[in-house]
Amino acid sequence: MVFSGILPGGGSEVRMEDWKRINDRLKELAMKHMPEPGAGKTDIPGLSISRRLANDVLENSLYTPCIGVMLQGRKKSVIGTEEYVYGEGQCLVIGVDVPSSFHVVDGTKDAPFLCLSLDVDRFQLARLALEVPPSSPGASEECLRGVSVDTVDISVLDAFLRLMELLDRPEQIPVLAPMITKEIYYRMLIGPQGEFLRRFHTLGSQSMQIAQAVTWLRDNYRSPLQVEELARRVNMATSTFHRHFKEVTSLSPLQFHKRLRLFEAQRLMLSERIDAASAGLAVGYESPTQFNREYKRLFGEPPHRNITRLRNAQSGSR
């Protein structure tokens, strides 16, 4: 098997053994710095490690713009209304904040699911995109779905390795981590997912306008949704905004808004152990009845039963 890409000092083709050597080293470092199942940030700004075991319990979260490299195992995510399965050797790029339900489908104690995730600094990537010529100058301006999965380029994998190695040389992080992070952005921009990233980081593009609307919704989900006003915020006609919003997120603005609220309410009940009425009020619902109805519609059961089941499942997986 041959992977496209250029290693520093290497040729234009890299064989499987070269890819495996880099990936194996990354797995060692990931397991060293995340010794138990879980997910968390590292001392490198924006870099997180995820180590998980296979389970049937769906977890809900808000995926934020990032570049994720899968090192081992497989994961299934339902993002919007679409299902994605991805694993070792693949790169997941999130272009816009999206609510997701996910679980690991392949991960054991000896070979857990391992993933590295690098947050995308929108301003830095947008500035870099202006300096890097597009790979397809005549590319369409149509909106893209906000999620992309492709084979990871070995040059990106190698840059992630050099970034991870800094965890063992913390004194070098302040100087070298920003440089390697910028290199990862650059290599992604010139790679197979470059056009995808560029669409969400080009001022005035329809995808970036939708990303701006999504950011506003994320920051203001407790407030009532006025779609016409939100469309005006990003300089779009309401009908155009509706169409492009669904193209990017696979959800309507109203569905997206509800999902943000309900995911946060579920998180509050699970992690802060507040009751359903308080959780609904905290995320913007004025009517407990409406909150319970919409919660059951999304999660398939009333809040109390859902939270009890999730807590029992979490206890059983420990």
Located regions from the model:
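A short, N-terminal "cap"/entry segment at the start of jelly-roll beta-barrel domains
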Residues: M1-D43, S48, D56-V57, E141-L144, ...
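Amphipathic alpha-helical segments enriched in hydrophobic/aromatic residues interleaved with Lys/Arg
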Residues: R15-K20, L26, R127-E183, R187, ...
